[in-house]
Amino acid sequence: MENKVTLSDLVRKNIPVILKGSKHPLTEKELLEELAKKIPELVKNGEYRNGVLRGVLNKLSTQPVDRLGISREGNRVKYYFITDKKTELQNVIRNLISEIKEKELLTVDYLNDSPETIDFIKDVSTHVKDLEGFTR
């Protein structure tokens, strides 16, 4: 019996190869464009077959891609990258900073916040600025 390699299998196998060669995390669209250069079958009638990549990404919990990391920017944009400890730490820091900013937790309310809270917010704000330096 012959084992057929599906297009999804090819995509799953090539995602780490593409991302390892990239100098920065890629969006889904950028990842698809790079994969299509390596796997011509991802383009049909001049259109990207984004459903193939989408299917692979939707099944990550049951069929993981080796060392694939995902980070979010806001609610919409996801970035894909190859992980190592440094990259994972940078993304955890990015996500933390993003959440702090989205929830406006560093905004001081001088009328309602206690002096201790105001001092705490100022201290945290300084540390957040320091942490931002590690994400570059």
Curated annotation (Swiss-Prot):
The gene is yonI. This is SPbeta prophage-derived uncharacterized protein YonI. It comes from Bacillus subtilis (strain 168).
